[in-house]
C-alpha cells in the first residue's frame, strides 16, 4: 500500500532526524570525525540533510506546476 504524500512528507524527515540522533548518540567522535567522505559518520549526516531538502524542493516544484496550470 502506498502512503499518502502528506504522510510521507512528515515521515521521511522524522526518520532522517531519528537516524541523525541515533548516530550522534552511538558515535564517540561524532562532530570531530565527520570530515572525511570515507567515514560512515559523514553519510549519517549527509542523508538527514539531503532527504528533507529533496522532499521540500520536489513538493515546491509540484505546487508551482499546479499553480501555473490553474492560473
Swiss-Prot record:
Coiled coil: none
Biological processes per GO annotation: GPI anchor biosynthetic process
Topology of this chain in the membrane: Multi-pass membrane protein
UniProt cross-references to InterPro entries, sorted A to Z: PIG-Y
Disulfide topology: none
UniProt gene name: Pigy
Topology feature Lumenal, residues: 27-44
Organism: Mus musculus (Mouse)
Transmembrane helix as UniProt keyword: yes
Residue ranges, Cytoplasmic side: 1-5, 66-71
Pfam families from the UniProt entry: PIG-Y
Domain of life: Eukaryota
GO cellular component assignments: endoplasmic reticulum membrane
Record's subunit section: Component of the glycosylphosphatidylinositol-N-acetylglucosaminyltransferase (GPI-GnT) complex composed at least by PIGA, PIGC, PIGH, PIGP, PIGQ, PIGY and DPM2. Interacts directly with PIGA; this interaction regulates glycosylphosphatidylinositol-N-acetylglucosaminyltransferase activity. Does not interact with Ras proteins.
Subcellular location: Endoplasmic reticulum membrane
Name used for this protein in its record: Phosphatidylinositol N-acetylglucosaminyltransferase subunit Y
Keyword Endoplasmic reticulum found: yes
Keyword set, alphabetical order: Endoplasmic reticulum, GPI-anchor biosynthesis, Membrane, Transmembrane, Transmembrane helix
Pathway: Glycolipid biosynthesis; glycosylphosphatidylinositol-anchor biosynthesis
Amino acid at each position: 500500500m502506498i502512503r499518502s504524500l502528506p504522510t510521507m512528507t512528515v515521515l521521511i524527515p522524522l526518520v532522517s532526524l531519528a537516524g541523525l540522533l541515533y548516530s550522534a548518540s552511538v558515535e564517540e567522535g561524532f562532530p570531530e570525525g565527520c570530515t572525511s567522505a570515507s567515514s560512515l559518520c559523514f553519510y549519517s549526516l549527509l542523508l538527514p540533510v539531503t532527504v528533507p531538502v529533496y522532499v521540500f524542493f520536489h513538493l515546491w516544484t509540484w505546487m508551482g506546476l499546479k499553480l501555473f496550470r490553474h492560473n
